[in-house]
Amino acid sequence: MLESGLVTLRDVAETDLPIFFEQQRDPDAVRMAVFFSRDRNAFDAHWAKILVDPVVFVKTIEFQKNVAGNVGSFELQGQRYVGYWLGKGFWGKGIATQALMKFLREDRRRLQARVAKSNIASIRVLEKCGFTIAGEDRLAIQPGGEEVDDWVYERGGS
């Protein structure tokens, strides 16, 4: 377990999943992240794969002993990415920045992150953690859905 201040990273427990499910359903969070919410079956299938995939490195974020969200890294099309999600009640407290900084001490590989250009809070988190803009892209957030302008951020490994 990684601990510093009031933010802790630990292995994901099965009991975290219902909290993650509700967090990813929040309309404000979905709108800000420009991400789609999964229904229960799709969510369960997604996390079942994550939890057994040896390439995925994922941690639960706790704040004051409450499950605040998750942070993880994964491979996609030959690149290593990092992503994080916080429940709305944990926004604006510096939790995402602290959690990502702690995570980066454990996963020291070169990482990329995609962030919607409209997601200013997440852009600030990435920049505070040493990520810089490496490019931009348009990405469909759902099959057949609208496309979103993304920044591609990158942070070198050590």
Where are these regions (language model features)?
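Acyl-donor (CoA/ACP) binding surface of acyl/acetyltransferases
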Residues: M1-P18, E22-P27, V58-S158
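Conserved GNAT-fold acetyl-CoA-binding loop/helix
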Residues: D28-A48
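Short loop/turn motifs at secondary-structure junctions and domain boundaries
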Residues: K49-V55
